[in-house]
């Protein structure tokens, strides 16, 4: 069950940098949360000493700095953890910054199961039982949980659901952004190792057998026109575009942010290049996609 109580930053918060302090119970998902925030464009510092957090913020406020969103993962194993957190909040307040505190928790049963699956001991366990270590940490962090801006219970949240919760709270985009690479290649040189989807366009006539087209690549207007004007080319592009829209929606739901579509022909010079350019052009108008074109095997012949 996801428990969310979010309070916006105060009116005194500095608009030049947004700061989130990520904490919570060990095993509740701090590491996963850090990765999600990184994917959202946040600069993430894991277990940065408290005395360096304000210095990091000062760097973010400096002219020309690219740090506009800073997330700091704070670990209960730090000495004087509770006091450290309050000290950081007070120091940032003097700079006109009101950081948000994200607290991650889970049920004792869920935490025990996760630790047993990973065969790890709890940081506060010592010579005690795992359950006692969890109870000690829960008591230690009770005051921080009470004052947190956002509390997420990850007991029954799979990773995609946790990612979605983090995105709702901390993404500046209403729809998750996905980076798409459309890559042409030649089958005779092997499949791209990083391809998520592979499509074979050797069903189209090969410009290699047209003397005036052979020297050119699929980027040349005459070759592109030849390939795209073949029977079935338009229908293929339209159908495959609609298929990709379904897949992209699924990627968003599963929290995937990168996709590589490999388009292959025999040598990676004519048909795959022309189709790659056309397919990328059809995806480019989607503001929620970042489309990149790569022609792996151009120049190899």
UniProtKB/Swiss-Prot annotation:
Q: Which UniProt keywords apply?
A: ATP-binding, GTP-binding, Nucleotide-binding
Q: Which residues bind ATP?
A: 24-31
The terms under GO molecular function for this entry are: ATP binding; GTP binding
Q: Which InterPro entries match?
A: P-loop_NTPase (IPR027417), RapZ-like (IPR005337), RapZ-like_N (IPR053930), RapZ_C (IPR053931)
Tell me, what's a Pfam family for it? Answer: RapZ-like_N
- Binding of GTP: at which residues? 75-78
Keyword presence, ATP-binding: yes
Which NCBIfam families does this entry report, sorted A to Z? PRK05416.1 (NF003828)
Q: What does this protein do?
A: Displays ATPase and GTPase activities.
The record, for HAMAP family, names: RapZ_like
> Which family does this protein fall into?
Belongs to the RapZ-like family.
Q: Any idea what this protein is called?
A: Nucleotide-binding protein MAB_2783c
**What is the native source organism of this protein?**
Mycobacteroides abscessus (strain ATCC 19977 / DSM 44196 / CCUG 20993 / CIP 104536 / JCM 13569 / NCTC 13031 / TMC 1543 / L948) (Mycobacterium abscessus)
């Amino acid at each position: 069950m996801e428990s969310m109580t979010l309070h916006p930053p105060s009116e005194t918060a500095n608009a030049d940098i947004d700061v989130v302090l990520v904490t919570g119970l060990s095993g509740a998902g701090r590491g996963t949360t850090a990765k999600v925030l990184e994917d959202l464009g946040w600069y993430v510092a894991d277990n940065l000493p408290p005395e360096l957090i304000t210095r990091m913020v000062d760097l973010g406020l400096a002219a020309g700095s690219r740090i506009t969103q800073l997330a700091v993962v704070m670990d209960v194993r730090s000495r004087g953890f509770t006091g450290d957190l309050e000290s950081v909040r007070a120091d940032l307040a003097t700079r006109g910054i009101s950081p948000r505190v994200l607290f991650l928790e889970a049920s004792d049963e869920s935490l025990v199961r996760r630790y047993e699956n990973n065969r790890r001991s709890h940081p506060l366990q010592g010579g005690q039982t795992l359950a006692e270590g969890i109870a000690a940490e829960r008591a230690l962090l009770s005051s921080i949980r009470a004052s947190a801006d956002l509390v997420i219970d990850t007991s029954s949240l799979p990773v995609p659901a946790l990612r979605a919760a983090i995105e709702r709270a901390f993404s500046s985009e209403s729809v998750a952004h996905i980076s798409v690479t459309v890559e042409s290649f030649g089958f005779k040189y092997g499949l791209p190792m990083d391809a998520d989807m592979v499509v074979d366009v050797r069903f189209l006539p090969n410009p290699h057998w047209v003397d005036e087209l052979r020297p050119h690549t699929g980027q040349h207007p005459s070759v592109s026109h030849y390939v795209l004007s073949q029977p079935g080319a338009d229908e293929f592009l339209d159908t495959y575009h609609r298929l990709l829209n379904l897949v992209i929606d699924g990627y968003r739901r599963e929290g995937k942010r990168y996709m590589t579509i490999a388009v292959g022909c025999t040598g990676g010079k004519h048909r795959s290049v022309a189709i790659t350019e056309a397919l990328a052009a059809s995806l480019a108008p989607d503001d929620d996609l970042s489309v990149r074109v790569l022609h792996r095997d151009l120049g190899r012949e």
